Amino acid sequence: MATSMLGSLLRIVRQVVPSSASGQARSYYVDWRMLRDVKRRKMAYEYADERLRINSLRKNTILPKHLQEVADEEIAALPRDSCPVRIRNRCVMTSRPRGVKRRWRLSRIVFRHLADHGQLSGIQRAIW
């Protein structure tokens, strides 16, 4: 009795909930690497002012060594992803990390493909 009721309930739920909701979820980002990079960019933006102030204390040679060491400890206490060195430019279409044209935020491969097919306005092949 209970199993048949559970089975009929499952059939009803499958009809009500669309199949896309139970399948793979799509997001704005191409893959997890791009999402990770976006999170790092947000973190670097949040801690940019604090990091700049602490680094200026660390690199100031006029201040006493004790104060510089305290600043070193404070920088070490900040999250790793707040450091702008960990940010990587990625292609917005493929998330490829290398060969990215910064102006268009596209990898060289995607850039050439789109330029060859006339999908980038103002871009044309060199003719001489």
Swiss-Prot record:
Broad class of where this protein is predominantly found: mitochondrion
Subunit structure: Component of the mitochondrial ribosome small subunit (28S) which comprises a 12S rRNA and about 30 distinct proteins. Interacts with LIAT1.
Family affiliation: Belongs to the universal ribosomal protein uS14 family.
Protein's cellular compartments: Mitochondrion
Gene name linked to the record: MRPS14
Transmembrane spans: none
Official protein name in the record: Small ribosomal subunit protein uS14m
Signal peptide extent: none
Keyword Kinase part of the UniProt annotation: no
GO CC annotation: mitochondrial inner membrane; mitochondrial small ribosomal subunit
Organism in which the protein naturally occurs: Bos taurus (Bovine)
Domain of life: Eukaryota
Keywords, alphabetical: Mitochondrion, Ribonucleoprotein, Ribosomal protein
GO molecular function, one term: structural constituent of ribosome
GO biological process: mitochondrial translation; translation
Pfam families: Ribosomal_S14
